[in-house]
């Protein structure tokens, strides 16, 4: 394998990160490839300097505080159209109830939310409105402008605000590359270009979780539901619009 630059993949859920992790398993030797950093307790006391590829569901601000060589790494991520992203994330957690082995390995707080989501008809405006009006706890942290949260790391109990949005856009502008899920293949090729990887690489694999059954279909044809969900995507939308209108590479 060719020597590649040290990288950190900021793995925002439901943005094709499983595919990217699988790709880099082929590019980086096993002993220098580490995924799912969120599963490691006491990260502050660990040394990751020997790892070429780091990936995890860890907000960027937190990663920069606990990984000592973060300034030496190329950092990239993928973002997604916010309504589609929100619905995919809600659906993924809800669908855990249909797969007992996967359901059982998740923390109780996730199981509790999955069971709650399973009782909601997300095509029913009144039920969705009731859910949004009462959202708190883990559901707030999981669904409130989750992509902005992955940059700025606000408290789980705190709603995001316009200051978080501005900070997230500023942080995103400073990392090596921000890819777009809706332009996935081109974004992956651009990541490889930023890393100076010129190998003959196949991108034929299917996206992980691509069969995730959605709780709402054709959201953009349902203006009333979009209006109800808007508080959960308003700042993510500003972040997304910023990067679909600009050159996505900051290299």
Question: Model regions: which residues?
Answer:
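A cross-family signal for N-terminal binding/gating loops and helix N-caps
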Residues: 2-66, 78
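A residue-level signal for conserved active-site and pocket-lining positions in enzyme catalytic cores
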Residues: 16, 81, 179, 191, ...
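Non-transmembrane alpha-helical segments in soluble domains
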Residues: 21-25, 83, 87, 188-192, ...
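PAPS-dependent sulfotransferase catalytic core
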Residues: 53-64, 166, 200-250
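PAPS-dependent sulfotransferase catalytic domain
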Residues: 40-52, 56-77, 84-200
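Short hydrophobic "helix-edge" motifs at membrane interfaces and signal-peptide entry regions
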Residues: 5-7, 70-72, 226
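Short loop/turn segments at strand-loop or loop-helix junctions that form parts
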Residues: 79-80, 204
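Short, charged/polar micro-motifs that form catalytic or ligand-binding hotspots
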Residues: 9-10, 14, 44, 177-181, ...
């Amino acid at each position: 394998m060719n020597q590649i630059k040290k990288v950190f993949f900021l793995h925002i859920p439901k943005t094709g990160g499983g595919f990217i992790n699988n790709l880099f398993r082929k590019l980086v030797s096993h002993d220098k490839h580490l995924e799912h950093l969120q599963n490691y307790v006491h990260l502050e006391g660990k040394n990751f300097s020997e790892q070429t590829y780091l990936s995890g569901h860890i907000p960027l601000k937190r990663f920069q505080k606990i990984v000592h060589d973060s300034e030496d790494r190329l950092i990239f991520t993928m973002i997604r159209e916010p309504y589609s992203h929100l619905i995919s994330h809600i659906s993924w957690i809800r669908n855990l109830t249909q797969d007992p082995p996967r359901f059982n390995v998740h923390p109780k707080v996730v199981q509790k939310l999955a069971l709650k989501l399973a009782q909601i008809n997300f095509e029913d405006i009144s039920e969705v409105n009731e859910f949004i009006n009462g959202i708190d706890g883990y559901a707030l942290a999981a669904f409130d402008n989750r992509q902005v949260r992955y940059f700025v790391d606000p408290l789980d109990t705190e709603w995001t605000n316009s200051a978080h949005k501005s900070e997230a856009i500023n942080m995103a502008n400073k990392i090596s590359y921000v890819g777009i899920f809706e332009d996935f293949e081109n974004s992956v090729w651009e990541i490889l270009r930023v890393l100076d990887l010129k190998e003959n690489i196949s991108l034929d694999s299917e996206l992980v979780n691509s069969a995730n059954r959605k709780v709402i279909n054709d959201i953009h044809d349902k203006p009333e539901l979009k209006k109800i969900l808007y508080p959960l995507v308003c700042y993510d939308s500003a972040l997304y619009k910023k990067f679909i209108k600009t050159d996505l590479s900051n290299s």
